[in-house]
Regions:
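Solvent-exposed beta-strand/coil patches in large extracellular/periplasmic or lumenal scaffold regions
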Residues: 144-179, 196, 203-207, 271-278, ...
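Outer-membrane beta-barrel proteins
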Residues: 108-112, 226-228, 276-278, 348-350, ...
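N-terminal type II signal-anchor transmembrane helix
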Residues: 2-63, 128
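Short extracytoplasmic
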Residues: 57-84
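Extended terminal
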Residues: 1-25, 236, 347-349, 407-411, ...
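Outer-membrane beta-barrel architecture
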Residues: 118-120, 162-164, 236-240, 281-285, ...
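Secondary-structure transition motifs
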Residues: 2-13, 65-66, 82, 86-195, ...
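Amphipathic hydrophobic-ligand
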Residues: 66-68, 94-108, 179-191, 210-225, ...
Length: 521
């Protein structure tokens, strides 16, 4: 019996035809590249000098500036030839030389020539002057550009469409007339720029004046939007920028960058990462190892003076709020207090529609004495400044977690859980003339809200401060343990203590106690 042959289906015939068509296109492309490669090596390279006018005209169209080439030569070695240009001059509107490049080496390929570009562009010993004028316009080697002219900047689009750009041994002078800053001259400037269709990777290294510090590097990895391939406008890019300063005088950066704080002094090493979205910095992280720091963190605040500080700090913008954190941050105050290197993460978002403002705080190893010492120099708000001044806290917060709703100045709801050792609080006055008790030498495990809370209290070689209870307000204690609860009702406060066991030089015993503010007012 003869079995009938299976005839190919319409789908199989379509797939086979598509495969043949794709193979033909691929072969045609390879043939085109082979012809272009042969023309490049066999016709263009030997006659490169004859193409100088065309190269000048094409460069002028790409950059939007007149271009003159002093001399040109080419070598055909390997698959990709190299073309050397000497004394390349960019001219201003009056025909004067605005920028002179002593030596430029380009490596074209058939693929790059289809886009009127190069596989690699090498620039040696350029001398560049960049100036931001008082009206905000940028002048590069005497050629003026608007800061907002990135949408149709032909020179930038061409530069960021090249496969690789290398600058070696350059010199850069930056003058900011808008800020009134002194000129900054950078020597031995090296730049490496690699571009893909949507990717832009760059590396910048330079040596500043000796008073600024040592040689530093900047590294960036950015991507353009999906529908903006080879977009030269950096205001559309997103990615990350990394800076590495092995030794820098931070106070000098304030003349050229908005740091958000006034830094009068500070020297040491800084490594920083900045997150960028559509050309705007939205967050960042910095590793610090600085000495002799003198900074003012806000208006009407005292200067913060730290003989030394090291650790990691970071933050980012949130919708209507912010996030700030530290990791292993250690510092010493000018009064000799030492911050022990704890971690902190603070997040606060503003009100949006019917949702109120809210926040979250997590921290460990917080030195309350150091915090009280520098509290007036930190932007904590009037309520926190007043509390630190009134209660002068001491002790180590082993861990704390706090959440809240409402503005920081007038919290609507809050919840706090924490453990503190070596706690000391001064007695403080409340509204209506009442006074809160104080304590010293305490270890506390606490949970509290705006309506009240509870705490496990243990005191060793400490005491209680009870204004108005005894003739001598300070009650010394060798040992004390207690379970404490309290309730808050507006200005009124009620406290109950159970399972209280105590001993001192005069007495020992167990008791239950309660205390409350008066009902006056």
């Amino acid at each position: 019996m003869i079995e009938p042959l299976n005839r190919p289906t319409r789908l199989l015939r379509f797939v086979a035809g598509l495969a043949r068509w794709s193979l033909g296109c691929l072969l045609a492309l390879w043939l085109l590249l082979a012809v272009a490669w042969g023309a490049l090596h066999g016709w263009i390279v030997p006659r490169i000098g004859e193409f100088r006018p065309q190269l000048e005209a094409q460069a002028a169209r790409a950059l939007g500036l007149p271009v003159r080439i002093g001399a040109i030569s080419a070598r055909s070695e390997g698959l990709i030839p190299t073309i050397e240009l000497l004394d390349v001059a960019l001219l201003d509107a009056q025909g004067r030389v605005a920028l002179l490049l002593p030596r430029v080496v380009v490596a074209p390929s058939p693929r790059s020539l289809l886009n009127w570009g190069f596989e690699q562009l090498y620039i040696e010993h350029p001398d560049l002057d960049i100036r931001r004028q008082a009206d905000g316009r940028i002048a590069v080697a005497g050629l003026t550009f608007s800061e907002t002219a990135g949408e149709n900047n032909a020179a930038a689009d061409w530069l960021f469409s090249q496969g690789e750009v290398v600058v070696k041994g350059g010199r850069l002078r930056w003058t900011d007339e808008l800020r009134g800053a002194p000129e900054l001259a950078l020597e031995n400037v090296d730049v490496l720029l690699r571009n893909g269709s949507w990717q832009h990777n760059m590396h910048f290294a330079a040596t500043p004046p000796p008073a600024w510090g040592d040689r530093f590097t900047l590294t960036g990895r950015f991507r353009a939007p999906l529908l903006r391939a080879r977009d030269g406008n950096w205001q559309h890019w997103s990615g990350q920028l990394f800076a590495d300063f092995s030794r820098v005088d931070v106070s000098r950066l304030r003349h050229h960058a908005d740091l958000g704080v006034e830094v009068a002094q500070g020297r040491g090493a800084v490594r920083a990462w900045a997150d960028v979205q559509r050309g705007q910095i939205v967050g960042g992280t910095a590793d610090l190892a600085l000495t002799e720091v003198n900074a003012t963190l806000g208006p009407q605040l005292k200067a913060l003076v730290l003989p030394s500080i090291q650790g990691r700090m970071g933050g980012r913008r949130l919708a209507g709020g912010f996030e700030f954190y530290t990791q292993g941050l250690q510092f010493q105050t000018d009064d000799g207090l030492v911050w022990p290197g704890g971690n902190l993460r603070l997040q606060h978002t503003g009100a949006a529609g019917k949702a109120p403002a809210q926040g979250d705080l997590r921290a460990d190893r917080l030195d309350l004495a150091a915090l009280a010492q520098i509290g007036s120099r930190l932007p904590l708000g009037a309520a926190a400044h007043s509390a630190l001044q009134t209660y002068t806290p001491q002790g180590l917060v082993n861990e704390v977690h706090a959440t809240w709703r409402g503005p920081l100045e007038t919290l609507q709801q809050y919840q706090v859980r924490g453990k503190v050792t070596g706690l000391a609080l001064a007695a403080g006055a409340r509204e209506a003339g009442n006074t809160l008790p104080g304590l010293s030498g305490a270890s506390v495990d606490v949970e509290m809200t705006q309506a009240g809370g509870k705490a496990s209290l243990a005191i060793a070689s400490g005491g209680l401060v009870l204004p108005g209870v005894f003739e001598e307000p300070v009650l010394p204690l060798d040992q004390l343990s207690a379970e404490v609860r309290w309730q808050v009702d507006g200005p009124r406060l009620a406290v109950q203590a159970s399972n209280v066991r105590f001993s001192n030089a005069d007495a020992q015993g167990e008791l239950r106690a309660s205390w409350r503010t008066s009902d006056a007012g």
